[in-house]
Regions:
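Sec/Tat signal peptide C-region and signal peptidase I cleavage site
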Residues: 13-17
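Bacterial N-terminal signal peptides
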Residues: 2-9
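Acidic, glycine-rich flexible loop segments
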Residues: 88-139
Length: 150
Protein backbone atom coordinates (compact mmCIF):
# COMPACT_ATOMS: atom_id res chain seq x y z
CA UNK A 1 0.00 0.00 0.00
CA UNK A 2 1.30 3.44 -0.90
CA UNK A 3 0.57 4.83 2.55
CA UNK A 4 2.72 2.12 4.10
CA UNK A 5 5.36 2.56 1.41
CA UNK A 6 5.53 6.26 2.22
CA UNK A 7 5.66 5.67 5.96
CA UNK A 8 3.73 8.87 6.54
CA UNK A 9 2.34 7.91 9.92
CA UNK A 10 -0.19 10.75 10.03
CA UNK A 11 -3.27 8.92 11.32
CA UNK A 12 -4.17 11.93 13.48
CA UNK A 13 -4.65 13.98 10.31
CA UNK A 14 -6.77 11.52 8.32
CA UNK A 15 -9.98 13.07 6.99
CA UNK A 16 -13.17 11.00 7.02
CA UNK A 17 -14.10 9.43 3.67
CA UNK A 18 -17.51 11.11 3.63
CA UNK A 19 -15.70 14.46 3.28
CA UNK A 20 -14.36 13.59 -0.17
CA UNK A 21 -15.75 15.83 -2.91
CA UNK A 22 -18.46 14.54 -5.26
CA UNK A 23 -19.42 15.81 -8.73
CA UNK A 24 -16.37 15.52 -10.95
CA UNK A 25 -16.84 18.03 -13.78
CA UNK A 26 -13.59 17.62 -15.69
CA UNK A 27 -10.57 15.34 -15.90
CA UNK A 28 -7.48 15.87 -18.06
CA UNK A 29 -4.40 13.71 -18.42
CA UNK A 30 -1.09 15.26 -19.43
CA UNK A 31 2.19 13.57 -20.28
CA UNK A 32 5.64 14.66 -19.26
CA UNK A 33 7.98 14.12 -16.34
CA UNK A 34 7.78 14.21 -12.56
CA UNK A 35 10.36 16.69 -11.36
CA UNK A 36 9.92 15.84 -7.68
CA UNK A 37 7.54 13.95 -5.40
CA UNK A 38 8.51 13.67 -1.74
CA UNK A 39 7.09 13.48 1.76
CA UNK A 40 9.48 14.35 4.56
CA UNK A 41 12.70 12.49 3.70
CA UNK A 42 11.02 9.96 1.39
CA UNK A 43 11.86 10.85 -2.21
CA UNK A 44 9.31 9.11 -4.45
CA UNK A 45 10.31 10.78 -7.70
CA UNK A 46 11.73 7.55 -9.14
CA UNK A 47 8.35 5.86 -8.72
CA UNK A 48 6.53 8.42 -10.91
CA UNK A 49 5.26 7.57 -14.35
CA UNK A 50 5.06 10.15 -17.12
CA UNK A 51 1.40 10.98 -16.48
CA UNK A 52 -0.43 13.54 -14.37
CA UNK A 53 -4.21 13.72 -13.97
CA UNK A 54 -5.89 17.06 -13.34
CA UNK A 55 -9.42 16.84 -11.90
CA UNK A 56 -11.92 19.66 -11.30
CA UNK A 57 -15.02 19.27 -9.11
CA UNK A 58 -18.29 21.22 -8.99
CA UNK A 59 -17.44 22.68 -5.55
CA UNK A 60 -14.26 24.35 -6.89
CA UNK A 61 -11.90 21.63 -5.69
CA UNK A 62 -8.97 20.67 -7.93
CA UNK A 63 -6.86 17.53 -7.67
CA UNK A 64 -3.44 16.91 -9.19
CA UNK A 65 -3.01 13.14 -9.52
CA UNK A 66 0.65 12.10 -9.76
CA UNK A 67 0.57 8.63 -11.30
CA UNK A 68 3.05 6.25 -9.70
CA UNK A 69 4.20 2.74 -10.58
CA UNK A 70 2.04 -0.24 -9.56
CA UNK A 71 -1.17 1.78 -10.05
CA UNK A 72 -0.46 3.96 -6.99
CA UNK A 73 -1.63 7.58 -7.12
CA UNK A 74 -0.35 10.51 -5.04
CA UNK A 75 -2.97 13.29 -5.15
CA UNK A 76 -2.59 16.89 -4.00
CA UNK A 77 -6.03 18.49 -3.59
CA UNK A 78 -7.49 21.84 -2.63
CA UNK A 79 -9.73 24.76 -3.51
CA UNK A 80 -8.88 27.38 -6.13
CA UNK A 81 -7.30 30.51 -4.74
CA UNK A 82 -9.47 33.62 -4.82
CA UNK A 83 -6.37 35.80 -5.20
CA UNK A 84 -4.61 33.91 -8.02
CA UNK A 85 -6.42 32.13 -10.88
CA UNK A 86 -3.65 29.59 -11.49
CA UNK A 87 -3.24 28.54 -7.85
CA UNK A 88 -4.84 26.02 -5.51
CA UNK A 89 -4.85 26.26 -1.70
CA UNK A 90 -4.01 22.68 -0.70
CA UNK A 91 -5.92 21.14 2.21
CA UNK A 92 -5.35 17.41 1.68
CA UNK A 93 -3.13 14.72 0.23
CA UNK A 94 -4.74 11.48 -0.96
CA UNK A 95 -2.71 8.26 -1.10
CA UNK A 96 -4.24 5.55 -3.28
CA UNK A 97 -2.62 2.13 -3.64
CA UNK A 98 -4.71 1.29 -6.71
CA UNK A 99 -6.47 -1.67 -5.11
CA UNK A 100 -10.26 -1.63 -5.17
CA UNK A 101 -10.32 -3.43 -1.82
CA UNK A 102 -8.52 -0.58 -0.03
CA UNK A 103 -9.92 2.91 0.50
CA UNK A 104 -7.61 5.82 -0.32
CA UNK A 105 -5.97 7.45 2.69
CA UNK A 106 -6.83 11.14 2.97
CA UNK A 107 -4.40 13.26 5.01
CA UNK A 108 -4.96 16.88 6.05
CA UNK A 109 -2.35 19.24 4.60
CA UNK A 110 -1.58 22.93 4.20
CA UNK A 111 0.14 24.36 1.16
CA UNK A 112 -0.35 25.53 -2.39
CA UNK A 113 -0.03 24.48 -6.01
CA UNK A 114 0.57 26.67 -9.04
CA UNK A 115 0.15 25.58 -12.63
CA UNK A 116 -0.04 26.80 -16.21
CA UNK A 117 -2.40 26.20 -19.11
CA UNK A 118 -1.76 22.69 -20.53
CA UNK A 119 -3.32 23.74 -23.85
CA UNK A 120 -0.62 26.40 -24.44
CA UNK A 121 2.41 24.10 -24.58
CA UNK A 122 4.80 23.11 -21.83
CA UNK A 123 3.74 23.95 -18.31
CA UNK A 124 4.72 22.98 -14.78
CA UNK A 125 2.58 22.04 -11.79
CA UNK A 126 4.36 22.93 -8.53
CA UNK A 127 2.94 21.92 -5.15
CA UNK A 128 4.48 22.31 -1.70
CA UNK A 129 3.32 22.38 1.88
CA UNK A 130 3.13 20.56 5.18
CA UNK A 131 1.40 17.53 6.65
CA UNK A 132 0.98 18.64 10.24
CA UNK A 133 3.87 20.56 11.76
CA UNK A 134 6.69 18.18 10.99
CA UNK A 135 6.48 16.75 7.49
CA UNK A 136 6.97 18.72 4.30
CA UNK A 137 5.65 17.55 0.95
CA UNK A 138 6.69 18.58 -2.55
CA UNK A 139 5.19 17.47 -5.85
CA UNK A 140 6.04 18.93 -9.26
CA UNK A 141 5.50 17.82 -12.83
CA UNK A 142 6.49 19.33 -16.19
CA UNK A 143 4.37 18.51 -19.23
CA UNK A 144 5.91 17.63 -22.58
CA UNK A 145 3.85 20.30 -24.37
CA UNK A 146 1.42 17.97 -26.12
CA UNK A 147 -2.27 18.75 -25.61
CA UNK A 148 -3.99 16.96 -22.71
CA UNK A 149 -6.37 14.06 -23.24
CA UNK A 150 -9.84 14.25 -21.76
Amino acid sequence: MLATMLAVGCSAWVIRAEETPPNLVGLLTVRGQCLKVSIARDDLTGRCTGELGMAVYADGRTGFHFMMRSRHIFTVSGIHSKQQSNAVQVDRIVLNDGLETNKPEVIAAEGSCTYGDPYRGRMTVRCAGKLGRLQDFVASFETDGTPPTE
